[in-house]
Amino acid sequence: RPPKGFKETKAFASVAWDLLKARPDIDLMPPCHQKVTREEDLDLNHLPLLRPWPEDAGGAVTLGLVITKDPETGVPNVGVYRLQRQSAKTMTVHWLSVRGGARHLRKAAAMKKKLEIAVAIGVHPLLVMAAATPIPVQLSEWLFAGLYAGEGVRLTKCKTIDLQVPSHSEIVLEGSISPGEEMMD
């Protein structure tokens, strides 16, 4: 229903203004693009990854944002999932089947497509909070963080895949997951 009277109109305008301010901004000259390592030069062994448990197969990314996109709708998902280094060029991602990234992977598999994935490491804690908070699927984690911060998140386009990442990320990893590609974690 439309707002009735000045008070309701003012409250509606305030919410609309907050939403407008919270929209993500695109950064054309992002700090995360200052140093780019090509795929052939990539060695994940150079990343400062922790081994959380002595029997773990390799180091793990802690508090990295995992960014995927629904292959049908293009709606992004940002989550915090366990990422473990398996080799100099590969990592595993461990997500629960009910989470957004896992849903995107199932859809990509049904379409016989690879799922593009980006990992943003060294981001503002507010972005980690937004990614870890259960919010409705229709609400973007970027918009949620912007609403909380009172200003839009600064994003930039990835170099090799069609995803956006926080432009002030310290490290961005870009890659893809092939349907059916599974490894022990």
Task: Identify the meaning behind each predicted range.
Residues 1-185:
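Extended, highly charged
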